[in-house]
C-alpha cells in the first residue's frame, strides 16, 4: 500500500470531500487539499454526466446553475431561512420542470442544517430528464 502525504479532492461533491477528510484526518497523517469546482461558461460544474445531456439539456442545466448562484447570493445577503429555501425549491421545480432530490443550505464546517452568521453552502441534486446532477455553491 502507498502512504501519501497529500490528497487533492474536488469540491464538486462537497459532502463526500467532508466525510473523506474527516475519516482520513482521524486515521492517517495525510493532508486533504480541496480543489475548487471547475465550471463552464454557463456556470455548470464540469462532470462526466454532462456528456449524457443533449445541447438543450446542457443549456437548461446551465440556466439552473445560474439560478442557484443567485440563490446563494441571496443566502449570503439576506440570511435566507430553511422555509425560504423550500419555497425556492418549489419555484425551481416549476420553472424548469425538474425533479429535485434536495436543495438545502448547510454549515460548511459540520454539515449541520442552515445556521445564521455561519459559512453556509447550498447543496442540490436534481434531474434533467433521467440524468441526476449534483452541485453546491
Predicted features by range, described:
Residues 113, 121-137:
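Short, basic/aromatic-enriched C-terminal tail that caps enzymatic domains
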Amino acid at each position: 500500500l502507498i502512504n501519501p502525504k497529500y490528497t487533492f479532492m474536488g469540491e464538486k461533491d462537497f459532502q463526500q470531500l467532508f466525510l473523506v477528510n474527516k475519516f482520513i484526518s482521524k486515521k492517517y497523517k495525510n493532508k486533504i487539499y480541496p480543489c475548487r469546482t471547475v465550471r463552464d461558461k454557463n456556470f455548470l460544474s464540469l462532470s462526466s454526466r454532462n456528456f449524457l445531456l443533449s445541447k438543450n439539456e446542457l443549456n437548461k442545466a446551465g440556466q439552473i446553475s445560474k439560478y442557484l448562484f443567485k440563490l446563494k447570493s441571496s443566502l449570503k445577503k439576506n440570511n435566507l431561512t430553511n422555509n425560504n429555501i423550500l419555497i425556492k425549491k418549489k419555484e425551481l421545480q416549476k420553472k424548469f420542470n425538474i425533479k429535485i432530490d434536495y436543495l438545502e443550505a448547510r454549515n460548511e464546517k459540520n454539515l449541520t442544517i442552515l445556521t445564521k452568521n455561519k459559512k453556509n453552502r447550498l447543496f442540490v441534486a436534481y434531474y434533467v430528464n433521467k440524468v441526476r446532477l449534483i452541485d453546491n455553491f
